Amino acid sequence: MILDELLAIPADATTATIQGVEMQIISADQADNMLEADTNDEKTHECILKNGRFLFESENGELKALYKVHI
């Protein structure tokens, strides 16, 4: 499950691979723009966890992109 895999990423990690997808580091502005562009919450999803703020994109239940927001 994606949530468990995200929680396993160390808070200070700058690299990680989940389900074969490499995590990319993005700015808070980039994250906000991505979320604003997906007004129906169909493509980009956000998880704010104890180890960071993550955005991910999935299609048909398959992870396509993973982002960690740099603070």
Language model segments and positions:
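Acidic, low-complexity, intrinsically disordered interaction modules
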Residues: T15-I71
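Long, charged/polar, surface-exposed segments that mediate recognition or autoinhibition
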Residues: A8-P10
